[in-house]
């Protein structure tokens, strides 16, 4: 019986990255032997055991055979006669197929160390194409390690392109697809994840709403990058540089889906695209089982980002209606999220990457003033029932109007 540290822990150690989880592989043991040593079996589909003290996972060496569609269409064979190399052969990428024995020696039958040094994401064997989830995993690794200079090996990209043309991708469950998306949204370069999926052809299969944005033009005056798909990737990149909140990043990703619905004869204009995108976002979120928190913010950003951009032109009544509709009174954190997404939208354009966004300070000032209106004072003044709400609304409009005047005066003083 031999125990090896495998997978991400070995890879990340070689990359001098912090190690989050350790996975171990056991060669030459049976489930009965593991249980006699105090390990507790937890794996249903294949033998995985928890260490009696550390609770870390130890999996028996195994091989896999394709028996059906999808990432779950495999039968596993775990036996004491399965070798280290046979187990590593079933893994996705060479950089994930390196093992370390208990003496610290590295076992690298598929040259993963060389690929780490060359910054290459390369598949281990042709069996890579049997698991459609690997298309998403490689895209996620490309995004995760983009800052380290990793690229997908040409032969691996060719395999991913072939896989995207088969029915395998459609066999993936929404939960597994979203799991990979969510992990990518939490990484440093989520835009790379979607760029890779587009490059291999998986984007139009799994996320047709996003793929449809590429090739849709926007007015060059406001969007020097012109292409809506490119703009969307730039906005997503901007959002990830500003916040780690995955809900904001998701909202940035889908804020312009309505532009794909604009009639070609109206291009490059996209009137009402924010509202047109609402049913598209709802459909996408329902299909992928997107969490309600993400969906609700995405709908808000799509619906209101044009209003936020035009904040200085909005009447005070319209600003209060925006606050009411978004329920900022009970969820003030959503205003911050909305503004972050709008800043990302504004800066996600060629040449505008460092542009100031005074609309954010202005709307924050409006909300602070409106939220400080004292309801108790209104009640004390004798208002009752529905009159209280009307008086509160009028007072909020009044204080926002004052903020508006103060802002205009301060801007006038700054203008030479």
Curated annotation (Swiss-Prot):
It catalyses: a tRNA precursor + 2 CTP + ATP = a tRNA with a 3' CCA end + 3 diphosphate; a tRNA with a 3' CCA end + 2 CTP + ATP = a tRNA with a 3' CCACCA end + 3 diphosphate. GO terms for biological process: RNA repair; tRNA 3'-terminal CCA addition. Gene3D superfamilies: Beta Polymerase, domain 2, cca-adding enzyme, domain 2. Residues 228-329 form the HD domain. Monomer. Can also form homodimers and oligomers. HAMAP family: CCA_bact_type1, CCA_bact_type2. Catalyzes the addition and repair of the essential 3'-terminal CCA sequence in tRNAs without using a nucleic acid template. Adds these three nucleotides in the order of C, C, and A to the tRNA nucleotide-73, using CTP and ATP as substrates and producing inorganic pyrophosphate. tRNA 3'-terminal CCA addition is required both for tRNA processing and repair. Also involved in tRNA surveillance by mediating tandem CCA addition to generate a CCACCA at the 3' terminus of unstable tRNAs. While stable tRNAs receive only 3'-terminal CCA, unstable tRNAs are marked with CCACCA and rapidly degraded. This is Multifunctional CCA protein. It comes from Shewanella sp. (strain MR-7).
């Amino acid at each position: 019986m031999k125990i090896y540290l495998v997978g991400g822990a070995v890879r990340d150690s070689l990359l001098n990255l912090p190690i989050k989880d350790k996975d171990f592989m056991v060669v030459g043991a049976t489930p009965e032997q593991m249980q006699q040593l105090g390990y507790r079996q937890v794996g249903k589909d294949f033998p995985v055991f928890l260490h009696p003290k550390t609770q870390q996972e130890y999996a028996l060496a195994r091989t896999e055979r394709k028996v059906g569609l999808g990432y779950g269409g495999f039968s596993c064979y775990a036996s004491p006669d399965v070798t280290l190399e046979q187990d590593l052969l079933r893994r996705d990428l060479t950089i994930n197929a390196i093992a370390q024995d208990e003496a610290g020696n590295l076992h690298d039958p598929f040259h993963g160390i060389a690929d780490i040094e060359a910054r290459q994401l390369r598949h281990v064997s042709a069996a890579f194409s049997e698991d459609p989830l690997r298309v998403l995993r490689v895209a996620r690794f490309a995004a995760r390690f983009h800052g380290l200079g990793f690229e997908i090996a040409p032969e691996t990209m060719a395999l991913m392109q072939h896989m995207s043309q088969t029915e395998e991708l459609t066999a993936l469950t929404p939960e597994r697809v979203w799991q990979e998306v969510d992990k990518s949204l939490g990484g440093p370069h989520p835009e790379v994840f979607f760029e890779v999926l587009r490059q291999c052809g998986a984007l139009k299969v799994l996320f047709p709403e996003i793929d449809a944005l590429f090739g849709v033009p926007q007015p060059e005056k406001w969007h020097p990058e012109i292409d809506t798909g490119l703009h969307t990737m730039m906005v997503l990149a901007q959002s990830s540089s500003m916040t780690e909140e995955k809900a904001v990043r998701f909202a940035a990703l889908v804020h312009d889906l309505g532009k794909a619905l604009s009639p070609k004869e109206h291009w490059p204009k996209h009137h009402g695209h924010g509202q047109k995108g609402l049913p598209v976002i709802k459909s996408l979120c329902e299909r992928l089982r997107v969490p309600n928190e993400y969906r609700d913010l995405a709908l808000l950003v799509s619906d209101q980002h044009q209003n936020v951009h035009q904040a200085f032109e909005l009447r005070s009544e319209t600003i209060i209606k925006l606050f009411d509709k978004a329920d900022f009174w009970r969820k003030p954190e959503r205003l911050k999220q909305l503004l972050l997404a709008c800043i990302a939208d504004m800066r996600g354009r060629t040449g505008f990457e460092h542009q100031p966004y005074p609309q954010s300070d202005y709307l924050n000032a409006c909300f602070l003033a409106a939220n400080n209106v004292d309801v108790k004072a209104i009640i004390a003044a004798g208002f009752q029932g529905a009159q209280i709400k009307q008086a509160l609304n009028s007072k909020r409009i009044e204080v926002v109007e004052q903020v508006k005047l103060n802002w205009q005066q301060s801007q006038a003083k700054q203008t030479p």
